[in-house]
């Protein structure tokens, strides 16, 4: 499984993003990545579906940079990750906190 994770400079985003709220930029990114088969996981982390490969990741990032003129100047860091195993650690947290099943 592949993932894309990124960090946007919110100060620059306020200056470059044309909409009323710079927070709308995250929804724009979510919609664009959805078109390439990515699902929002948390924050600025998107997991690719079964058909997403390394090439799809590169094409998706190229699309973001071309589609949104505010993207390139505001992105501080962006990574493609390959996830070998999907391990949910929430049961550990819940057990320590005494909550959950």
Where are these predicted regions, by residue range?
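Basic nucleic-acid-binding interfaces
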Residues: 2-3, 11-101
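Active-site flanking residues adjacent to catalytic metal/cofactor-binding acidic residues
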Residues: 6
